[in-house]
């Protein structure tokens, strides 16, 4: 190989590495955008004001809560309640507890989904920590609220007849350390 082709190969490989690093930083925001646009993976609806606050269904549904943390993020993240039983149209407030176990301030972000996936379109979030980056100072512990309801149309959808339990699952990922 000539020096020119070696140099060309080196620049190509360097460009590939830089592209991969940039894509890894963009992966979580791009995934969130993809899920919001397509509804993929049990992505929920989001509202600022509940239109169903006075309209309640009759069919009880159990909502279970799940929490996961990426291995690169030294946080403890757990739901304060393992499950709640609600009816469609009932506004519900739950909390997740998050603690930074490191000696550094860290910014993290979460993604979420609802299973079974077919029920995600009926899960309406009113307020959630998942739409913003979260800064936790070293050793800090915080409660993160989620307000939601199940759309009343859930009861009328024949595909939802077999659904008795929904799971709201969050996964936190590290965005970056904060320089002191």
From Swiss-Prot:
Parts of the chain on the Cytoplasmic side: 1-8
UniProt-listed Gene3D superfamilies: Ctag/Cox11
GO biological process: respiratory chain complex IV assembly
Name the record gives this protein: Cytochrome c oxidase assembly protein CtaG
Source organism (scientific name): Rickettsia bellii (strain RML369-C)
Family to which the UniProt record says this protein belongs: Belongs to the COX11/CtaG family.
Periplasmic topology ranges: 30-180
Chain segments annotated as transmembrane: 9-29
SUPFAM superfamilies in UniProt: Ctag/Cox11
Subcellular location(s) of the protein: Cell inner membrane
InterPro entries: CtaG/Cox11_dom_sf, Cyt_c_oxidase_assmbl_CtaG
The entry's keywords: Cell inner membrane, Cell membrane, Copper, Membrane, Signal-anchor, Transmembrane, Transmembrane helix
NCBIfam families hit by this protein: PRK05089.1
Cellular component per GO, a single term: plasma membrane
Pfam families with a match to the protein in the record: CtaG_Cox11
Molecular function GO labels: copper ion binding
Entry membrane topology: Single-pass type II membrane protein
Role of this protein: Exerts its effect at some terminal stage of cytochrome c oxidase synthesis, probably by being involved in the insertion of the copper B into subunit I.
């Amino acid at each position: 190989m000539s020096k020119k082709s070696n140099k060309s190969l080196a620049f190509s490989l360097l460009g590939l590495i830089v592209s991969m690093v940039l894509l890894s930083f963009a992966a979580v925001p791009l995934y969130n955008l993809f899920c919001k646009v397509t509804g993929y993976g049990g992505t929920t609806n989001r509202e600022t004001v509940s239109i169903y606050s006075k309209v309640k269904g009759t069919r009880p549904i159990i909502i279970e809560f799940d929490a996961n943390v990426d291995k690169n993020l030294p946080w403890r993240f757990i739901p304060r309640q393992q499950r709640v039983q609600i009816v469609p149209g009932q506004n519900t407030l739950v909390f997740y507890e998050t603690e930074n176990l490191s000696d550094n301030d860290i910014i993290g972000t979460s993604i979420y989904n609802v299973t079974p996936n077919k029920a995600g379109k009926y899960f309406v979030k009113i307020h959630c920590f998942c739409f913003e980056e979260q800064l936790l100072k070293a050793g800090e512990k915080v409660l993160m609220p989620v307000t939601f309801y199940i759309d009343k149309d859930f009861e009328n959808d024949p595909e939802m007849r077999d659904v008795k339990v929904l799971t709201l699952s969050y996964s936190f990922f590290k965005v970056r350390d904060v320089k002191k």
